[in-house]
């Protein structure tokens, strides 16, 4: 929000210096990004009237002028501007003046003719371009001899504020003045709104077909206007110092009212409209050529203003070229509306352009301001362009309901740490336009129509704090009781997981939750992902249901930077659709390993990491849980090198090698290994229980079984563990053999069996029956003891 201090003072009767106001606004939460004078520093420039002009005797492009600069006698100045002529009033720098760049004016000769100064253009004074090739021509009533800085108020300060999205009420002079009044106690002088005399007969019918999107729409026809009328200099100056270029009187008036009171407006050429105005959603196939000369194809989630023939404007964003006013316009329709922020939000990104109107509408405009805006704009149109105003036509849809918020003085003291008297609290609320009602514990406030951000008690506490002044709150130590939350033995601390991954050589990464829809198809086989209504970009159109896509992208970035060994992990949320189309978000940990199993060294041959390397990392991560790995198929993973991670019969994640078909698509020289696990399962751990250590020696038996290639080691171990009794402490595979001596399609798998008793030394008589049951179980499962 950019504005001049002089304009602000018309509504806030403050005598603060510009520096003090800058500090006050910033400390109250309205950050001042920039504060500078309306024009760069220069001295010695006055208003002069050109009395006569003669051609230079020795230069075709120069003129010799006699000017009255208020010195009591005419001053001769040589001038080369093409628009110099007798009778005009212009800025004049006399000898001793200092212009931009420390350019000093002194008496000089130009082609033999004495020149006692210089007549100036806007460029030479650092003023906004007036579109004139030559001297800056001033109004005829400009007083000769007056300092130009004083006449044009060039020492005025122009403020640029960084308004946060919740403070749309401060996107106008009226809103800023209200704030200054609350902060300083100065008088708040609201712009006077006068009902226009009704002299015209035409009305513009209005119909709201989307009442949830448009709460109010007001139109007024003004007939017989002079569209060629010049915008007054005072209005031009205020617009220019607010960063808005003057276009034409009718357009300037709409912009002026928006800046003055905060209501965006639009002006239609009434003779280019057909029938009633309809506020509705766009229809399939509709297009619009906008005022910026861009033609856009409209989506059905876009609100438009249309007549009987078609779309006239993008509601709250930009008008259409076909219904725009021009120098030939004779009759106009003024529009002031309230559009729901939700329907305007994101449209600037969607269509690739925005406007001052959309900037305000998507943040929220006062829904009681529209009639005042029409009356104010009408007053200015009649004053500048003439015409006859007709009656206002108003249509109403669904408007927001005013919210009531309770403020407890005790809570205010607890949060701010300072005891502010109730009467002072009441005064602050009144100055902010929040009419307070006394209650037993404090005040009840009904949020005004211009404050969408007042919803809960904390909002009121913030308002009191910033107006009271954060600098006025004493630097006392706050005290309070902190209760430590007990961490049960069955839960690991989160930092332990991060430390565990770092200890295994993984680096933490963070990726976007918004991902490319193709990733969801490739890595999760998700044909119906959660789509964003207003994505930041096409490649961030959906919410992720897996972390794999982000990890693969990070791998690509590292490979592009010549990193040939990458191990990364991420702990983040993934999103999916639950029952009744509700969204579910779960936290997961994902990891990726690419490249060599070990860093290059002399003591170990280089080999690429494989499934068992990353499986070992997963086992280490889940060492406090009993888990098993079950062969599976997953859209992201190699068909023969993928496993589900199962705990207590529930699948808690997966691990494996990336599918070969994705290597070429994602430009990967070799396959990375990945895993993804529910974070809740990772944080769980089984309670540690005491287990006595046997003082008797263990007994080991090695068994080799011949089995079909289709039989997995999990099948064998499941059969053996099912037949084991309490003497069996461990069963594990230690060798697999294929080749000579075995029938085709068969393999040999050797297992070790560790037996131990807590009370006795084991004998063959005790061990052999146990081993026999294990052999029988393996035989029943399809494996034969190898002889």
State where each predicted segment sits:
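Phosphate-backbone binding interfaces of nucleic-acid-interacting proteins
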Residues: 1-200, 333, 352, 356, ...
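Beta-rich nucleic-acid/ligand-interaction surfaces
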Residues: 39-43, 195-198, 482-483, 487, ...
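Terminal amphipathic helices with adjacent charged low-complexity linkers/tails
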Residues: 180, 184-209, 385-412, 418-419
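Glycine/proline-enriched, intrinsically flexible loops and inter-domain linkers
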Residues: 4-5, 23, 63, 184, ...
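Extended, well-folded interaction surfaces typified by the phenylalanyl-tRNA synthetase beta subunit core
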Residues: 175, 405-565, 569, 701, ...
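Mobile "lid/hinge" segments at catalytic clefts and subdomain interfaces of large enzymes
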Residues: 111-126, 130-137, 148-153, 157, ...
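A carboxyl-terminal module marker
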Residues: 2, 431-434, 582-584, 598-787
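Conserved mixed alpha/beta core segments that line enzyme active sites in large multi-domain catalysts
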Residues: 47-76, 236-237, 254-322
